[in-house]
């Protein structure tokens, strides 16, 4: 049988080097549809309208609130601090590409017991002091430089990874701004909706009180029973109870806006008037194409940057399996002294190099490669999930807007009929042709219809805000500042 060649250390090293040469795993590009499934009509995205989408609602109070929130919100400040952290990490990684300079120094003294008798005939006898204790001093001061050459690019890969982390942090900061703008707009819409509900309840209470007065007058005239008076009074009291609960929710909505704006409690209540309606964007919102999300949505840009950073870390882990070469150089001065008998000082210079070849590390480096690959796969799955959720958000918003627009039209038609029925019931009751229950039912129907129209308008405004945000609106995109997803190793 042929004998097997022994595995020499060099063979093991070459095996490790060959395994390190394997490329970073390639992953397929994301599957993005060409058009929106629920789009009413295809229109290119309006970048200018998306950048300041809150102005599309034509509400100066909303525009002012969003701008103040973007200037003062604490979540945005925290996100910007994370950008500064990423920049510091880049400086730290990039420093590995350059030499390091140190100014080391040392000094020491030794005390040696002298038990020997002086010997004048010894060649060094004249330099050896005859003290009982001999002191030996040494010192050194030097300027030292060390440079690990990045021959195979491991440090460069980590530096590029840190750059992608900055890109991710910047995108996350933009995403934080978009979230603040969205929450502010949603909070403002809810506030105006609650104010509208309050106005309806106040009007309903006034109508109920008027109906109660009519019932009392008719009762005193003997035309109706006491039951009509008590029923009308109960209706008024029920509406007043609803008003008390609504005032609590209204206070909560105002306080939530104060927190978003990073202002003291009560600021919003003092600054906003109560006469505004729930704002709506009257113009249609062009959704563009699904592919636009990859350039507009900051969360997708952040995920793509995280994926690119993970790919570069995987590449760096593979490059760590290659040999290393470092150069050291030093210049300085050193000195020696032997008690009072002898002293000397001189200049020196050193130049050297160290070479390292991975040999036996119990699979530490290969485990680092496996870990980097797993993190890369996690980043890839995270990007895919974020993209799927982004597509779902846009489709869901398109469905909501289309449905809420049709629903609002139907609710307005219902309101016209309810109001007419209430007017007819009031006239009939005054003429004695209808009983109080019919009037109360008509009043409840009219109030409920008006509330439903308000709720439908609120739902449509909320859906419009959600679509603007889902499309990545709220910032001016710099095409030179964002890389394509194809550059993320997909």
Residue ranges and their predicted role:
Residues 75-76, 228:
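Outer-membrane beta-barrel proteins
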Residues 23, 95, 154, 262, ...:
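Short, conserved catalytic or interaction motifs in soluble domains
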Residues 59, 72-75, 148, 182, ...:
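Short loop-to-helix capping motifs
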Residues 219-315, 319-322:
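Acidic, glycine-rich loop-and-beta core segments that form the ion-binding/anion-interacting portion
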Residues 2-71, 119-126, 139, 163, ...:
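Terminal intrinsically disordered/low-complexity segments used for targeting and assembly
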Residues 65, 87, 97-175, 284-389, ...:
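Small/polar-residue-enriched beta-strand and adjacent coil segments characteristic
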Residues 72-73, 221, 431:
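Charged, alpha-helical scaffolding/interaction elements associated with membrane systems
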Residues 78-93, 176, 180-203, 207-217, ...:
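Amphipathic alpha-helical coiled-coil segments
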């Amino acid at each position: 049988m042929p004998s097997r060649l022994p595995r020499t250390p060099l063979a093991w090293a070459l095996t490790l080097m060959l395994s390190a040469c394997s490329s970073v795993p390639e992953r397929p590009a994301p599957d993005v549809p060409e058009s929106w499934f629920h789009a009413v009509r295809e229109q290119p995205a309006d970048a200018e309208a998306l950048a300041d989408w809150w102005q599309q609602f034509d509400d100066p109070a909303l525009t002012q609130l969003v701008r103040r929130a973007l200037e003062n919100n604490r979540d945005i400040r925290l996100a910007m601090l994370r950008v500064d952290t990423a920049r510091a990490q880049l400086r730290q990684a990039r420093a590995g590409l350059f030499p390091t300079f140190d100014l080391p120094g040392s000094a020491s003294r030794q005390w040696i017991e002298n038990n020997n008798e002086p010997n004048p005939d010894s060649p060094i006898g004249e330099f050896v002091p005859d003290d009982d204790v001999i002191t030996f001093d040494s010192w050194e001061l030097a300027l030292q430089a060390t440079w690990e050459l990045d021959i195979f690019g491991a440090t460069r890969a980590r530096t590029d990874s840190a750059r992608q982390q900055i890109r991710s942090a910047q995108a996350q900061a933009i995403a934080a701004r978009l979230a603040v703008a969205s929450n502010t707009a949603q909070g403002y819409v809810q506030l105006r909706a609650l104010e509208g509900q309050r106005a309806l309840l106040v009007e309903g209470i006034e109508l109920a009180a008027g109906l109660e007065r009519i019932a009392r007058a008719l009762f005193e005239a003997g035309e109706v029973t006491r039951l009509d008076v008590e029923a009308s009074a109960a209706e008024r009291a029920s509406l007043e109870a609803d008003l008390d609960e609504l005032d609590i929710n209204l206070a909560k909505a105002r306080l939530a806006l104060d927190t978003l704006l990073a202002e003291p409690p009560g600021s919003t209540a003092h600054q906003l008037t109560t006469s505004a309606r729930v704002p709506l964007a009257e113009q249609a919102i062009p959704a563009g194409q699904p592919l636009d999300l990859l350039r507009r949505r900051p969360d997708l840009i952040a995920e793509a940057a995280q994926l690119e950073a993970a790919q570069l870390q995987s590449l760096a882990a593979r490059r760590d399996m290659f040999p290393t070469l470092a150069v050291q150089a030093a210049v300085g001065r050193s000195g020696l002294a032997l008690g009072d008998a002898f002293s000397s000082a001189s200049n020196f210079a050193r130049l050297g190099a160290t070479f390292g070849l991975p040999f036996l590390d119990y699979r530490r480096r290969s485990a680092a490669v496996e870990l980097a690959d797993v993190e890369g796969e996690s980043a890839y799955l995270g990007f895919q999930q974020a993209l799927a959720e982004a597509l779902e958000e846009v489709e869901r918003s398109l469905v909501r807007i289309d449905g809420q627009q049709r629903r609002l039209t139907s609710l307005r038609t219902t309101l016209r009929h309810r109001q007419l029925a209430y007017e007819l019931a009031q006239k009939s009751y005054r003429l004695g042709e209808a009983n109080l229950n019919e009037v109360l039912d008509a009043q409840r129907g009219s109030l409920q219809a008006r509330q439903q129209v308000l709720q439908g308008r609120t739902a449509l405004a909320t859906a419009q805000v959600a679509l603007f945000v889902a499309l990545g609106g709220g910032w001016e995109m710099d095409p030179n500042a964002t890389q394509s997803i194809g550059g993320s190793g997909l």
